[in-house]
Amino acid sequence: MKKLFVIILLLVLGACSNGKEAGGTEKSTRETVVNKEKELKFVVAPQYEGKTSDLIELGKKLTKEHPELGSKGNMAIYFTGAVSDGRAALMLVNKTDVDIKKDLEFSLSWSYDGKTIFDNQKISYTIKDSGELPSYTTTLILLPLNSEQLDLVDSMSDPSKMTLSMSDVKSVE
């Protein structure tokens, strides 16, 4: 339950940071914008198509319930609040007009309450293992955590103390 609360709070805070001010006018403007954008879809690698798991269901649910994830023209990454077999489940969002059909590399920085989980960690997203990431889709990536990182991630309770960013995104030939 705690993790579900963290997930919802993260998504709400992320959504709030995109708005100019709180109130009824923002809500109707946001609904209009979301309706005009392409629909965000959750995808899995071909080897997982037709299969189900708690993580796949979580990815589908978050994508359906939070179409505001990411920003138009950009890629983004979010922590789902889930950890499975010592691996953190992060959601990669592609809201660009480009279908990702080649392997990607990017740097990930992630901290909580001033304590580093990853510092410019090079992450590889391989098409062979993870599948293509078409325009306006989301997918999950699982990052292995050592025991110290796992303890820190498990202790997270205040989303406002977390920072997570990706940089240096590039296609790999």
Q: What spans do the regions from the language model cover?
A:
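Membrane engagement elements in two modes
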Residues: 17-87, 97-101, 105, 147-151, ...
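Intrinsic-disorder/low-complexity, polar/charged segments enriched in Ser/Thr/Lys/Arg/Asp/Glu/Gln
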Residues: 85-89, 138-140
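Short solvent-exposed strand-capping/beta-turn motif centered on an Asx-Ser/Thr pair
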Residues: 93-99, 113
